[in-house]
């Protein structure tokens, strides 16, 4: 009977019982955890791996992000890992043998003040220096790329230009998770859902396994990829992470015919908008200012987001909001991720991505897998070590996202 059914996500991977031990246990079954498992198997031949997810596969931030993919970051370190990630995105549909609707429709980052203009042009030149495709567009050119933007001078924050990355775009987030899960499963990785980590087994300052709601699992190495709950996991392991967790809201509209050809982001007024493949408008804004782990936020953030969006896109004035939701973003003091070894031997961490987690999915998995396999960081994630908060070698990317950190 199963052979007669159409392909469905629940049939793309097995749901085994946990084994007593694994070479590597990855905590967190979202995009980063699944990508790490895939690259451990593909690049390093390590297949005795378990991915533990406390709920359903990719049901956390992977299911709640706004799917934007880009690499136009200012600093060399950020450009390096995000550009590597974008190049991996371009290869993955064929490599994973799964169409996750990767659409390179370009991303516009709007400038509304002279300060924005200067900073944007600086970022374009830095991108070019790092081999990242980037252009500076005048308001007239912005209108050509996205005709529905209001580029008039009669709005609060007139559009004075924009940076443009043509290779950037969006992808279907749940399909991305399914693609990684299926391929990792084919290589021998165990994907274990409804298995929450409640503690760690240690021999002195060395991790030897995890305690879970489905029993104790021994492990040669353990990697934390739990996004917003990373600080909770680190505390269970006996060390602290310099991150804070905030709610981040997003929303979608009802379905429309294709009207929005690209992705538009505005750091100044904190709104970003794209149109999904089915036709709904997908919007995000700034984080809620309070700390918390609730996957919901305050209504005033949505109100301010709507006001900004309607001013930039008058055509949206009569659109109806279909639903809103929230995710949990883990932010560092320099708005850059942590992909690193930890004070606990054989315990590794990937966290602090803030609002950039989805776009960094392949790059995070690629570099974390290397770090686990060799017990040394890849050159791309070496700058994102935990020790940078002691040495002061920070990578300040607060201006890189269209949200308030």
Swiss-Prot record:
Temperature dependence (free text): Optimum temperature is 37 degrees Celsius.
Gene3D superfamilies: D-Amino Acid Oxidase, subunit A, domain 2 (3.30.9.10), FAD/NAD(P)-binding domain (3.50.50.60)
pH dependence remark: Optimum pH is 7.7 in potassium phosphate buffer and 8.0-8.5 in glycylglycine buffer.
Binding, FAD: 31-32, 53, 61-62, 66, 68, 197, 354, 357, 359
Effect of residue 359 to R: Retains 0.07% of wild-type activity. Shows higher apparent KM for sarcosine
Catalytic activities: sarcosine + (6S)-5,6,7,8-tetrahydrofolate + O2 = (6R)-5,10-methylene-5,6,7,8-tetrahydrofolate + glycine + H2O2; sarcosine + O2 + H2O = formaldehyde + glycine + H2O2
Residues that bear Tele-8alpha-FMN histidine: 173
Subcellular location: Cytoplasm
Note on how the cofactor is bound: Binds 1 FAD per subunit.
Requisite cofactors: FAD; FMN
One Pfam family, short name: DAO
SUPFAM superfamilies for the chain: FAD-linked reductases, C-terminal domain, FAD/NAD(P)-binding domain
Activity regulation summary: Inhibited by Zn(2+), Cu(2+), Cd(2+), Hg(2+), Ag(+), p-chloromercuribenzoate (p-CMB), iodoacetamide, N-ethylmaleimide, CN(-), o-phenanthroline and sodium lauryl sulfate. Iodoacetamide (IAM) acts by modifying the beta subunit on two lysine residues, one at the FAD- and sarcosine-binding site (Lys-359) and the other at the covalent FMN-binding site (Lys-172). Inhibited competitively by methylthioacetate (MTA) and pyrrole 2-carboxylate (PCA), which bind to the beta subunit.
Gene Ontology cellular component terms for the protein in this record: cytoplasm
Xref: InterPro entries: FAD-dep_OxRdtase, FAD/NAD-bd_sf, Rhodanese-like_dom, SoxB
MF terms in GO: nucleotide binding; sarcosine oxidase activity
Enzyme Commission no: 1.5.3.24
GO biological process, one term: tetrahydrofolate metabolic process
Effect of substituting residue 359 to A/D: Loss of activity
Function noted in UniProt: In the presence of tetrahydrofolate, catalyzes the oxidative demethylation of sarcosine to yield glycine, 5,10-methylenetetrahydrofolate and hydrogen peroxide. In the absence of tetrahydrofolate, catalyzes the oxidative demethylation of sarcosine to yield glycine, formaldehyde and hydrogen peroxide. Can also use N-methyl-L-alanine and N-ethyl-L-glycine. Is very specific for oxygen as an acceptor.
Protein family per UniProt: Belongs to the SoxB family.
Quaternary structure annotation from Swiss-Prot or TrEMBL: Heterotetramer composed of subunits alpha (SoxA), beta (SoxB), gamma (SoxG) and delta (SoxD).
Protein name: Sarcosine oxidase subunit beta
Organism: Corynebacterium sp. (strain U-96)
